């Protein structure tokens, strides 16, 4: 227990603020320039406060001014040389541009080359930002264009972070010291680099920068899986920025220059053939949103349908007719291009859509030939032409089935098409390179297909020469039936590979159909599902191998017994057959579990229900072995069929959902890749015409040889120099046009973003800024009035603070100390040490208030106060705020005391019931009263049904009774009397006195009246509506009920009138003890009742002579006189 008491908790390590420091921070929070300037000047002279002190939330005065966006206060604090530390980072975080400029100017004055920046000197434990955060990084995180431009103009730089696999000394040391900080610093750096504003301001080519950064972030997301989501979000941000720039292109000329820009190529001129280098780069870096943008797609569509004007406006039937016509004529187009490539029909062949139709028609012809080969069309043709010759017909039927047979006419055509397909793939591999070639999955499929065809041709050649070699020793080697061939005969293997190649060739149609808007999205979904199937297949093979190994180990012996019973395999089959033990099904059953491969096949087909339990009825198998084998088979079926297959279905469904959500973007991206592949210069002729040498190819070969062998001549050198100068000029023109368009796009983008920011509705920050301006204006106005010689004690008293619930909360926490309570505190609101001395001056009053405020009005307490007044001999009281009663009114005072005694119990009983229902509100008030922060609690509610008639003013006559509660407190400074964190409230001293009927004592005094029909009715109403009765906030709910009951019994023929539940003071109240206060306006709003001066005098006046015409109850007037200030 002692250890817990002596433990220093984290919230106690902060140094406790003094009263003056709290006043200083509160003045800064409210925007009081004059008060803050006086305090700073005094602190500069006497150092009575620490101007760099922090509030319980760790904010210095400068940070509070930045949070409130008070530029004048920021300049004032900087002029008095407060520590800035990370104030620049805070101002950037708040996007306070003016403060950023002021702090940067201050930084230029105070920074030395050998020292650190101000934000680097802040403690890592208490600083809001990590050490790797610089002003430029933070501004980029906020994406504030204006602040980023200010920092870049002043020379701020943001270096590229090192690679994630970097092995330099700096990276190695950083990873060893703190790997988490090293990774987070890289993320912070990339988050800044991905800022659209920073890219627009610092890059000459923002689109290229966004592309490269997006690709780098994609790579990092695969390398650092722990931060994959963060990198993916930044990648998406870069893609959105590049797409947003594309939104602002207005003409086709701008779009063409943008998409055809090549940093190393010639300048693009309008009307030339588009090479679309920038768009190809976007496809390479997988910028799907950029490629699928409507502007890009419109340009691509215009290029795609360039050869067929009006094609898109035709109906579907006419479009089909045009496509079929061009497809049928593809040999004519191909031959025309070979013979005359620059003729009109040859140029038509170069149009992308015409080229696509010709290539598709060529591929459909190839598939038709494959179908003819699989159907052995030569046999049918032979049957047509040689139906009369049976010998010739048999020869033609047997020719394809013989070993080493020569290729048929259809197979020769297929070989020509395969040669053309291989040549086109070789040319593509030469143009784009191996890495780029392998990035496209369809290229991999084409490579596998062509490899199968090449292997088929090679095996056919091997089989042919093998048979020719055998015919030397056996002339009937080719007549051997197929069923007697060797199992691994090259002819059989070639047929298997050829059939597999046919499958891949047919699947290539899916790629061609991607141009269709209906089949294209399905093709994209299929490609995504293939990846899921491959992931699932890895797990499936693992389970399949595990159970296959187990079952083969368990059943291999009994499978061998079944094998011996098979007449086709066992040498004893004839003997077994004679004995009658031969089983024809044994030839099938023994293969089920004979080896690991056969067992694995058995389990695979079991997934489709093709294996039954009869396979476990082996020869000689025992009961336990059969049961154990069937149990393993059942477990495999549950795992594979119930679990894994449903998992595959769920994975494929998830993939389809992902694709369907962005099906349009995915399909347009895939279609754009296909379109651009036909925009290239080469590969114009389709297979098999592409293997025919053309005159253009011969001319290109001659030029290449001339350039290689004649490059050393003087003419070649002169031509080379001209080429260099021409390329330099072209590069200058290219860069000028591109940069001009890029500047326009960036300007439009920034303009639109600023308009979006300005068009946003009113936010909480805007409201807080208005509140801060009003608070600062109020403080400035009070200071002006004070300098003009006016009494501003009332106006500058407690005030309403900065305004608003949050500002009041900040001020309350500041004055209470919030989380810096001493260890010995047990209450909900701990007493503050520096105010404990104020308790010594008011011991008696604090004892009375210690339990509950209602004890102020007990009979004994009231009797003691009467005796004290009687002992004074009727003279004036020493207290200036407590006038004594004249001698002639002592009887009335004693009567009031007796009535208080009489009604005390009856009034306290219902009050105790009521206070239970309002325990929360009064508990808050009492706790707040303990720390002297009553001002924020007293103006929270207002009686909605009370009426204050300020026109009813009357002069009290002789004999009027007044109950006065006066309290004193130490002198308070700077007009923040109600916001101090004092631990006690000075207890009011109740005095019952009779006010004389002197005119001088009541000149200019107004009263508020309570209205009710009778004394008892008034008491009941006060009990029911005590929550709305205002005097209960100032003193105690019992006081008014007791006083009202007292007045009702003494003068039951007078009228009892009510006033507003909470009277507010006016600015012109004078502190004359001989007079009552002037009447106060009841129309004040709730914001005017935020706080009340605790050093006030409450006066209850009972005038038995001043009654209304129709009233039988006495008039009761109340007033509240402030000794140091009025209600703010």
UniProtKB/Swiss-Prot annotation:
Keywords: ANK repeat, Calcium, Calcium channel, Calcium transport, Cell membrane, Cell projection, Ion channel, Ion transport, Membrane, Repeat, Sensory transduction, Transmembrane, Transmembrane helix, Transport, Vision. Residues 347-403, 466-492, 557-629 are extracellular. This is Transient receptor potential-gamma protein. The chain crosses the membrane at residues 326-346, 404-424, 445-465, 493-513, 536-556, 630-650. The gene is Trpgamma. It comes from Drosophila melanogaster (Fruit fly). One of its GO terms (molecular function) is mechanosensitive monoatomic ion channel activity. It is found in: Cell projection, Rhabdomere membrane. InterPro entries: Ankyrin_rpt (IPR002110), Ankyrin_rpt-contain_sf (IPR036770), Ion_trans_dom (IPR005821), TRP_dom (IPR013555), TRPC_channel (IPR002153). The lineage of its organism: Eukaryota, Metazoa, Ecdysozoa, Arthropoda, Hexapoda.
